């Protein structure tokens, strides 16, 4: 394992010059970043994104691709703060659509809005007709391990998205608690 120490004089220097190769697992402890490449020790069934997708949905879930291409694209924009400080706002490119053959990624509270983190999937209507759509509230519930319509309590749809973006993934918490329980039992 290699170790690197980065030293910056101020936040502006960090913002302008920070670059770091993060691997797929890591923590920050006492201001130090520890990152390693890990491989899951799991041989069971893996739920893929396509497993939670509903085949036929209302038209209101389909979106205009161009706006999302811009939002999910890379940016490097000079901005000025309220105090007059000039800085560079930058974001890297995100994939326009989510890969249905992989596990779904984390959902944010802004899921129901038009933003770069919104999950988009590609729907092939025919060979020449490919559309893009956002997830339905039920798909969001499934992605987090909740039952269908769990948030359908009469609240507005945007709040259903918010709830799922603010939720813990039930299956993940359950599996982690079982594993922690096993570790604790072995230590007794």
Residue spans for each PLM region:
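Domain-level detector for long C-terminal conserved domains
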Residues: 1-7
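C-terminal target-recognition/interaction regions appended to catalytic cores
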Residues: 9-188
């Amino acid at each position: 394992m290699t170790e690197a120490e980065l030293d910056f004089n101020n936040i502006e220097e960090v913002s302008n010059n920070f670059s770091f190769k993060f691997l797929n697992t890591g923590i920050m402890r006492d201001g130090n970043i520890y990152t390693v490449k890990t491989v899951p020790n799991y041989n069971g069934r893996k739920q893929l994104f396509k497993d939670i997708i509903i085949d036929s949905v209302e038209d209101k879930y389909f979106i205009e691709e161009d706006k999302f291409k811009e939002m999910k694209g890379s940016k490097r924009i000079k901005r000025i703060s309220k105090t007059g400080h000039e800085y560079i706002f930058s974001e890297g490119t995100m994939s326009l659509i989510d890969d249905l053959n992989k596990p779904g990624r984390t959902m944010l509270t802004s899921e129901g809005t038009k933003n770069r983190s919104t999950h988009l999937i590609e729907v092939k209507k025919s060979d020449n007709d490919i559309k893009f759509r956002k997830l339905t509230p039920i798909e969001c519930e499934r992605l987090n391990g909740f039952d269908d319509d769990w948030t359908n309590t009469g609240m507005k749809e945007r709040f259903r998205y918010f709830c799922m973006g603010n939720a813990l993934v039930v299956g993940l918490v359950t599996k982690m608690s079982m594993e922690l329980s096993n570790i604790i039992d072995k230590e007794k």
